[in-house]
Amino acid sequence: MNRWENIQLTHENRLAPRAYFFSYDSVAQARTFARETSSLFLPLSGQWNFHFFDHPLQVPEAFTSELMADWGHITVPAMWQMEGHGKLQYTDEGFPFPIDVPFVPSDNPTGAYQRIFTLSDGWQGKQTLIKFDGVETYFEVYVNGQYVGFSKGSRLTAEFDISAMVKTGDNLLCVRVMQWADSTYVEDQDMWWSAGIFRDVYLVGKHLTHINDFTVRTDFDEAYCDATLSCEVVLENLAASPVVTTLEYTLFDGERVVHSSAIDHLAIEKLTSASFAFTVEQPQQWSAESPYLYHLVMTLKDANGNVLEVVPQRVGFRDIKVRDGLFWINNRYVMLHGVNRHDNDHRKGRAVGMDRVEKDLQLMKQHNINSVRTAHYPNDPRFYELCDIYGLFVMAETDVESHGFANVGDISRITDDPQWEKVYVERIVRHIHAQKNHPSIIIWSLGNESGYGCNIRAMYHAAKALDDTRLVHYEEDRDAEVVDIISTMYTRVPLMNEFGEYPHPKPRIICEYAHAMGNGPGGLTEYQNVFYKHDCIQGHYVWEWCDHGIQAQDDHGNVWYKFGGDYGDYPNNYNFCLDGLIYSDQTPGPGLKEYKQVIAPVKIHARDLTRGELKVENKLWFTTLDDYTLHAEVRAEGETLATQQIKLRDVAPNSEAPLQITLPQLDAREAFLNITVTKDSRTRYSEAGHPIATYQFPLKENTAQPVPFAPNNARPLTLEDDRLSCTVRGYNFAITFSKMSGKPTSWQVNGESLLTREPKINFFKPMIDNHKQEYEGLWQPNHLQIMQEHLRDFAVEQSDGEVLIISRTVIAPPVFDFGMRCTYIWRIAADGQVNVALSGERYGDYPHIIPCIGFTMGINGEYDQVAYYGRGPGENYADSQQANIIDIWRSTVDAMFENYPFPQNNGNRQHVRWTALTNRHGNGLLVVPQRPINFSAWHYTQENIHAAQHCNELQRSDDITLNLDHQLLGLGSNSWGSEVLDSWRVWFRDFSYGFTLLPVSGGEATAQSLASYEFGAGFFSTNLHSENKQ
């Protein structure tokens, strides 16, 4: 049996795991924490010799000792598939080869890496270590023709001692990497299958006597006033005889020395332990809200006082305890507002640079996120340093997932197999040792979706033996038999509420929810209401942070994103990897903006708006609101009536306080109170004045007495009637109706074509990812996407300066015997207004939800300048609207289109009182609904958006698709999660609604002023059901 198919052989010659740290020559240098400034740090990233092989045996024997001059090159770190070698494949949970534990395909893609590194004289007499922070999957190391060792565990640091193999001057380093190994069976995460040296490789030099490892711990007194810092240090002496040393240690608070002492006459023989502890009075406490860090600096000196090395460590005073079924951080109740984060770069795959990692964390902080789960494996060691600095609570997950066994009905197959215990336990042990000194880590997670069994229990006990200061999580320990937190994923709101009503003895979180695939997630507010209602639910992590699309460019220069199947890979899980709050290029999506608002730590509530009385609620757990300002603005239909700023003071953590706003005298217009809360100070992640949250409160409805629309340019209408059509002509317009469809086919205004495609009542939308289950289970089988419309009756009435066109149609799918009997009533007035009343009566049996009840038409493509009075500025839906407010907004059709990498319904604006689409000269169309509607406009047809699988497959139309929807199904998160809640569902049932279409010209009054008139002259009250008369 070879080494990569033997579960009892997890490594050879790999050093024991230990904390991640570096040695420096001075205290000043050490406190920079810049590893590249260390004289005994040598980065090996960059260009390497490389050759790709389909089989391990194809690698030539001379590879380990001879530089292959005719080979190509590859950048390290990189996934070799991203550099044009081998094949990418995306699966969510399935293994890409037959399950035959512990065996993997004999045709095992293999990368052979070589590079020369040069050691200066300064490395003589030193221990020389080589460290690999990430290699996928199995790799062997050779130096100067000598075998060093091998390792498994793709996302864990592997360290080897190569002191005996290196020399001053040039050295040949060779690494053979195989994509598949027995360890693949526990690395089946939801991501692209790829391989290579994808994190940094570097050399570390050590004096023969040095600090080998250390563990820092902080403990508070009962009053959480003073704290004890303790440190267990392991020192190593590689010399033949014992060495006497001094270990000095100093704790810095900025430039101030908090404590300084030493352990003198410390004799070191091989591995020797030492410890120190001291009290720190009233230390600043570390939390995600206030990530205050001290510097602990340890200096090791020889018997003559010469500095051997200086080792720094950032220290945060933080603890976590469980009490009364809740966990407490620094004796404070905390709720974790989190995300699940994979490593992914849209150009490099999992070879993620630290600039991108840092931007991720900055974006999280900007959007009120306070926790991150490293789904589902350890990150680059520097990730945790950044979390310490920026302030994020980390659930640090172990590199264990065997999800693929679920496909054969045995997800616990190896998790409950004692033969695999070493594999499982070793991974959590290596993980904890490496990252144990980070205050940001509050939870160790044993892995993900691997069933449950003896190996999980063994992992838990190993974790607790190493570190009893943190909580341990594993979601599939469903009864919380051993873990410290009970956890579920994708639990729906009603059951989540039930969990809150009947608390478990242990704290509860939901480690994955609100699947953020495509347009969504919806329903965040309803979830958050449950979380806030029940203290026992202390954490929630949206799935997931970032799309995993791979950027590509077509022949026309259009950027698009590849997903499963785009590389000819099969089986695959298609576009299931496009499920992030941010896009693959790190652009925030609408879902992230909604999440930011829903979890905002400063809440504003109305008490008595007539008196300007509000309430501010501080949902920070450690921090007052002294660094926040409230900005109030009273707006009336686009005009600011008053503004006010209030510096928030003396609002303690997790408390509330009254607020008083001075309201102006309001006129007849509809008015709102808009509140924005900003953070005053500049931070690492934001500028001063960074907005935290936005709220809107209605102050009054429009009470103006309606004035009928009566322009002075109206002329009598003429009606031209023939066998196929009828045309209504007025002062500056002509509208032609087809007698075959009952619809207008042409609308000319001042010589311009306004209408480009026949209008129609519409019950379908381009499928969004979160509606895929409804589409595949209901809509497609019932042919909703190909419903036909047939004219049953067409009538024309002319009287009193108006023409009525009445069309009665049936809209129904082929094959079935259900549908909607629809009535279109068009009132064309001499003044140019077109009043439209739409209604439908269902027949047959279809008791199910549908995407929408709406109306769509094609209009002149030049009318791309948009103004609307409704909810904005971003897209919004019934269950995803907290981040947007009602006002008058101006945009363009292009800007309102949310270009999802997998095209789908998008760009909706709710609660629209009126909208105008015009060209650059102000000519166009005004829409004034009888009651607020949903509105969207695209430069693409509905059919094209629905059929396209990638954004570059969208074919821009010459015209604009205008959608005026009565009801629109909420988003939900049912791509893998919760269905749309009952409140936001749309049913195939009787309906009635209406609106006015009015051509506008640049020289006429503005759309806003026109929209204030009353249209229809009693038409709507006669032709719409009572529900639409309000």
From Swiss-Prot:
Record key words, sorted: Glycosidase, Hydrolase
Coiled-coil regions listed in the entry: none
Hydrolase in keyword set: yes
Molecular function as annotated in GO: beta-galactosidase activity; carbohydrate binding
Outcome of substituting residue 92 to N: Improve activity
SMART domains from the UniProt entry: Bgal_small_N
Protein's job: The wild-type enzyme is an ineffective lactase. Two classes of point mutations dramatically improve activity of the enzyme.
NCBIfam families: PRK10340.1
Protein name per the record: Evolved beta-galactosidase subunit alpha
The organism of origin for this protein: Escherichia coli (strain K12)
